[in-house]
Amino acid sequence: MHELGIMIHIVEKVSALAEQNKLQEIQSLVLQVGELSPVVPHFLEACYPAAVDGTILEKTELKIEVLKASARCLQCDTIYPPVEHKTCPNCNSKELTIVGGREFLIKEIIGY
């Protein structure tokens, strides 16, 4: 489970941002995780309490938004969800490029 290491890194980055901006408390942290990302949202949530223990984020609410995957057909340029359609729903081509769903981002930090 590499999510613990990832979450510790996020906590360090957010803590540094809080210090730079002279924040006393972080109320919420919003992450975006693409459904094709190797990061598993459930595991991030499970290790979050251990990662924030004793930090400025200890009382912070974690929110995780899962971003749907999207692909572009290389034959007709149709954008479609590759998890739901193994071929292009417009032309049945199997040639595609992934254009979304691999993201892993800190979307929002709310604090004061």
Task: Give the residues covered by each predicted segment.
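Short metal-coordination and nucleic-acid-contact micro-motifs, chiefly zinc-binding Cys/His arrays
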Residues: 67-69, 84, 102
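Short cysteine-rich clusters marking metal-coordination/redox-active sites
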Residues: 72-73, 88-91
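Short microdomains enriched in Cys/His and/or Lys/Arg
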Residues: 92-112
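Compact Cys/His-rich metal-coordination microdomains
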Residues: 81, 85-89
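Short, intrinsically disordered, charge-biased short linear motifs at domain edges
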Residues: 58-64, 72-79
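Long, charged N-terminal interaction/targeting segments
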Residues: 1-58, 63
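Short aromatic-glycine motifs in intrinsically disordered, low-complexity regions
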Residues: 17-21, 90-97
